[in-house]
Amino acid sequence: MNTVVKLNNIFSGLPKKKKTKVLGRGIGCGKGKTSGRGHKGQKARSGVSINGFEGGQQSIFTRLPKRGFNSLFKSKYSIVNLSTIQRLIDSKKIENVSAITKQVLFNLGVIPSIKEKIKILGDGKLNTAVAIEYDFISKSAGSQVTLLSSVSEDKV
C-alpha cells in the first residue's frame, strides 16, 4: 500500500504557538465586555490576585497543622565522592595526592566554599592512596582512604 504525498495531505504537525485570544473587543467575539472575569468583585479588577485566598473558606495552609522547624545553626556539608577525587587524579588536575586540602578542592570547583565542612562519601573506587583533609567521612569511604583529618581532636 503506497501512499502518495500530495500538497493537500502533508501534515506539518500541530501549530508551534497557539494564538492568544483577543479580549474585550465586543460581545460578538465571545470574550467581550467582561473578558471572562465575570461581574465586579476584587478578582474582576486589574492587578489583583490573592495567594491562598479561597473565597472566604479557610485556606488549606491554615487548616493543616504546623510541623517542624529549620534550625539556624544547622551545619552545611559539601559532599565529595571518592569517584570525583579519582576522576581529578586521573585527569592530572590533582598532582600532589599526599595533601588534598580544602583549598585544592575549592580551586578545582569541587566545593563551593572553604568555610563549609566536607563529608567524604564512598561512591566510586580509589586506585591510589591519598591523604585528604575532611570533617566527616562515611564508613565505606574510610575503609578506602588513608586520611589526614582537619578536626582530629575538635570533633564532637
Curated annotation (Swiss-Prot):
Gene3D superfamilies: 3.100.10.10. GO terms for cellular component: large ribosomal subunit. Residues 34-43 have a biased composition (Basic residues). It comes from the Bacteria. InterPro entries: Ribosomal_uL15, Ribosomal_uL15/eL18, Ribosomal_uL15/eL18_sf, Ribosomal_uL15_bac-type. The keyword Manganese does not apply. One of its GO terms (molecular function) is structural constituent of ribosome. The keyword Plastid does not apply. Keywords: Ribonucleoprotein, Ribosomal protein, RNA-binding, rRNA-binding. Residues 26-46 are annotated as: Disordered. GO terms for biological process: translation. NCBIfam families: rplO_bact. Belongs to the universal ribosomal protein uL15 family. Part of the 50S ribosomal subunit. Binds to the 23S rRNA. This is Large ribosomal subunit protein uL15.
